Regions:
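Short Pro-Gly-centered beta-turn/loop motif in secreted/extracellular proteins
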Residues: 6-12
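Structured interaction patches on ligand/partner-binding surfaces of diverse proteins
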Residues: 20-45, 123-130
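Conserved beta-propeller blade repeats
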Residues: 51-65, 89-107, 136-145, 149-151, ...
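Structural motif
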Residues: 69-73, 116-122, 149-151, 197-203, ...
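Short loop/turn segments that connect beta-strands within beta-propeller blades
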Residues: 76-79, 157-160, 206-210, 258-260, ...
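Predominantly five- to eight-bladed beta-propeller fold
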Residues: 81-98, 109-165, 355-369, 423-433, ...
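Beta-propeller fold detector
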Residues: 81-86, 163-166, 212-219, 264-269, ...
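Serine-hydrolase catalytic core recognition
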Residues: 185, 191, 324-587
């Protein structure tokens, strides 16, 4: 109470706070940047609103479904229960997971194969309570491992029968998730993601026949960014939905007729991307969303707030300041506090109108005068064309406090090229770890090359089945352009370091670009993507194939040039420590 704590986490990881008695104090999803989770009465209200509601007593008499010995039974008040399925087994059981139609006549359930997850050993060499080492085994599925195969099945609670659903529509799945019942109870909607992440489909299941039809299907030549860009919002007052897609080459929102899957209209369009659906007001037919690159003259990674009518008209960008923004609305959503900054611009807080974004009042400006008196210098934002000679690559440089422009300084790139996000900070901050290194006499570079997220689909596609690329042609082009502008950069002495995926990237720099990078420090790298966690690697590499070996640092270890330092934590539960040791063995 009335305290604070700091935790390290990864973008996309979710934290559930004080889970007890079905009462959540807060739910927090980590972003790509430093963020603050404020825990109070409001966070509890939001958490409980986002949580699945507790099952309500069924208002239809004698309509409860339960699982007995892996099969579905219909429970009657007279205790003359009826068995509805007979094919369930321990290895392929029906699940205690039923979604009832609005009229209570139908229920959608699932049958799923059982998968025993892979376990990996972690060696604790120096336990505190004994002399001898200990081994801990943890569940750790890896690319290519089997996935539970879920298939939907319908139940007619009036006729007390099971309605088979064609399983061919759900074969070889990564996931199969219930999403929605139609208001008239005629169809259930399920989201199907095929293994390999190259097909994502919203399927409609006829409640009376079990027939499956496509409503929306995404099947790009490369991959669907399922983990980051799956955005689906049902419009309760109509049989319509909002669906996000990169079919235009940019991540945008579309209004879909849920009765037939036809696109009613694009809601957003242009050479920018929707980052998140923030709020939908069905009464006024307006959707609020966050966007990147919506101000073409700003850094394309600056986050802005906008709104647009569901028919695609009256697009209004509500934030204007040349920086990245975060916001908080009043309960009536008539006003919002807009906080924005850049790496080279302290934070500004403004009160704005939610109607048109007009400024009501400036609330505060961050004062860094004391910091400047201590010799603090702003990061130098810089952009230059990448490998294609036209796509702009963005990053920044951090220089030593006492930089002598008549000297030349070795350069160290701090790399993390994970395709789930972009990784160059955009808001104002001290960049303490990089500054400490700069004060030793280096210039530190942070760059987002092609293959990272939240630009165009083409920009992102460079990562597909090719994590070894890591945007290096763009990074090298950026550094060479920076050296032409800043004569104190010495590109004959370029080093690189990173951890996790950044550890993989750092070693890859010496293996594939040893003529440019002369030294690397690689911490806990996922050096062979077949050794790392299943979800992250299959998201960008797809199914197991020869391309995994081609991106493996272990496979290419014989190409090593320059000086390499490897570090690893023996109890690392995020990246299998064996990944680093296999690199050592390959040398």
């Amino acid at each position: 109470p009335k305290g604070d704590m700091s935790i390290s986490t990864f973008a996309g990881h979710q934290w559930v706070l004080d889970f007890s008695a079905n009462d959540l104090t807060g739910i927090f999803t980590a972003s790509n940047h430093d963020c603050i989770a404020k825990i109070d009465s409001r966070s509890r209200r939001v958490a409980m609103k986002q949580s699945p509601p507790a099952p309500k007593p069924d208002s239809t008499p004698a309509s409860k479904l339960v699982i007995r010995e892996h099969n579905v039974w219909f429970i009657r008040k007279d205790k003359k229960d009826i068995q509805l399925t007979r094919k369930g087994t321990e290895e392929d059981s029906f699940l205690n997971e039923f979604r009832y139609s609005p009229n209570k006549r139908y229920a959608l359930g699932f049958q799923s194969t059982r998968v025993i997850p892979r376990k990996i050993p972690l060696l604790r060499s120096s336990p505190k309570d004994q002399i001898q080492p200990t081994i801990e085994f943890i569940n750790y599925p890896k690319p290519g491992d089997p996935r539970p195969q879920r298939r939907p099945i319908l139940f007619d609670l009036k006729k007390k029968t099971a309605i088979p659903v064609d399983e061919a529509s759900f074969l070889d799945s990564w996931s199969v998730q219930f999403k929605h019942w139609s208001k008239d109870s005629r169809s259930a909607h399920v989201l199907y993601n095929k293994r390999g992440h190259q097909e994502l489909a919203l399927l409609s299941i006829d409640a009376s026949t079990g027939k499956v039809t496509d409503l929306v299907r995404e099947s790009p030549d490369t991959f669907v960014d399922y983990s980051q860009k799956t955005m689906l919002h049902w419009l309760d007052q109509s049989e319509q939905l909002i669906w996000a897609s990169e079919r235009s080459g940019w991540n945008h929102l579309y209004r879909i007729d849920a009765s037939n899957g036809q696109v009613i209209n694009p809601i957003t369009k242009g050479k920018w991307v929707v980052r998140k659906i923030e709020h939908v007001d069905e009464k006024s037919q307006v959707v609020w969303f966050s966007a990147l690159a919506i101000h073409p003259k700003q850094d394309p990674y600056h986050l802005h707030l906008a709104k647009v009518n569901l028919d695609g008209s009256d697009l209004t960008v509500l934030t204007q300041g040349d920086g990245t923004h975060r916001w908080e609305f009043n309960p009536e959503r008539t006003l919002f506090v807009d906080r924005w900054s850049r790496v080279d611009h302290p934070e500004v807080a403004q009160l704005r109108s939610a109607r048109d974004g007009s400024l009501v009042k400036e609330l505060a400006r961050q004062d860094i005068s004391a910091l400047l008196k201590e010799g603090y210098s702003m990061p130098i934002r810089f952009s230059a064309p990448g490998r294609d000679g036209k796509t702009m690559i963005h990053g920044f440089l951090i220089q030593p406090t006492e930089l002598d422009p008549n000297r030349i300084y070795p350069v160290i790139e701090n790399i993390y090229a994970g395709p789930h996000g972009f990784h160059v900070p955009k808001k104002f901050g001290l960049q303490i770890s990089q500054r400490r290194l700069a004060e030793l006499g280096f210039v530190i570079a942070k760059i987002d090359g092609m293959g990272t997220n939240w630009r165009s689909k083409k920009f992102h596609d460079h990562c597909w089945q090719n994590l070894a690329d890591a945007g290096f042609p763009d990074r090298i082009a950026w550094l060479k352009a920076a050296a032409r502008k800043y004569s104190w950069l010495d590109l004959s002495r370029v080093g690189i370091y990173g951890g996790s995926a950044g550890g993989q990237n750092a070693l890859s720099a010496l293996l594939h670009h040893g003529e440019f990078y002369k030294a690397a420090v690689s911490d806990c790298g996922c050096h062979d993507n077949r050794m790392d966690k299943i979800w992250w690697n299959e998201a960008w590499m797809g199914k197991i194939g020869p391309h995994y070996e081609q991106s493996s640092n272990v496979f290419h270890a014989h190409k090593l040039q320059g000086n390499l330092m490897l570090t690893v934590g023996e109890l690392d539960k995020n990246v299998d420590p064996a990944s680093t040791l296999q690199v050592v063995d390959a040398q």
